[in-house]
């Protein structure tokens, strides 16, 4: 299945790792290195081995030239988040999942910088839908970023946004909403903001 997704990717991607000295970062490095070996369209680079604990562990999805696509995963994209991470790669590299024209137009209408944080756990079955929706929007519009956080490794964020349940969507560090959402529901929140 992975071969099919990777073979359809239109352009190569660079996966940049931001690590520190915790075992979870070593685990992320092994995980992403192994993933990178599955396709010649994925290159892996260690960007920082002494990254801040606010960032690490993190894998940023970048274009081949190192420019960020706006998609990133903070933690290890395994469990229920593995498929959504692979879809994020596919959506960033193109052609991506098919979008209805009205949805594409709404995504194009986002003109202000929109930073989305999606707080998840790897065992959450409702989180991937929101992750995929947010990443699809970010992959389509350079004004939008979608950073996914496994909150087990980011207690400060959990406390800052008073996260009692996941998924939790935070837009521009201000607008906080909880629960499963599709792409239209995410767009409604962004566009009314």
Where in the sequence are the language-model features?
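Structural micro-motif
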Residues: 12, 50-71, 158-172
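Non-catalytic, surface beta->alpha helical segment in thiol-disulfide oxidoreductase systems
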Residues: 61-96, 170-193
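Short, conserved beta-strand segments within well-ordered enzyme catalytic domains
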Residues: 14-16, 45, 60
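Short, surface-exposed acidic/glycine-rich loop or hinge patches that mediate macromolecular interfaces
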Residues: 22, 76, 121-124, 151-152, ...
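Local sequence-structure signature of Cys/Sec-based thiol-disulfide redox active-site neighborhoods
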Residues: 2-39, 108-142
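Thiol-based oxidoreductase modules, predominantly thioredoxin-like and allied folds used
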Residues: 20, 40-51, 142-156
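Structured core of small recognition/catalytic domains
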Residues: 127-193
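N-terminal leader/targeting and pre-domain segments
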Residues: 1-12, 84-111
């Amino acid at each position: 299945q992975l071969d099919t997704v990777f073979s359809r990717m239109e352009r190569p991607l660079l996966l940049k790792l931001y690590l520190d000295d915790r075992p979870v970062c070593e685990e992320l490095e092994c995980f992403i290195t192994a993933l990178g070996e599955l396709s010649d369209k994925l290159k892996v680079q260690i960007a920082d081995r002494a990254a801040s604990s606010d960032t690490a562990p993190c894998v940023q999805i970048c274009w081949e030239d190192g420019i960020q696509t706006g998609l990133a995963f903070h933690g290890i994209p395994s469990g229920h988040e593995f498929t959504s991470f692979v879809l994020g790669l596919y959506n960033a590299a193109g052609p991506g999942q098919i979008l209805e024209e009205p949805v594409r137009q709404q995504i194009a209408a986002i003109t202000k910088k929109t930073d989305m944080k999606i707080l998840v756990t790897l065992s959450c079955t409702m989180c991937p839908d929101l992750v995929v929706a947010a990443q699809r929007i970010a992959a389509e519009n350079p004004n939008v970023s979608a950073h996914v956080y496994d909150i087990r490794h980011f207690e400060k964020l959990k406390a800052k946004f008073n996260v009692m349940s996941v998924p939790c969507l935070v837009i521009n560090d201000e607008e906080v909403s909880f629960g499963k959402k599709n792409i239209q529901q995410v767009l409604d929140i962004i566009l009314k903001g």
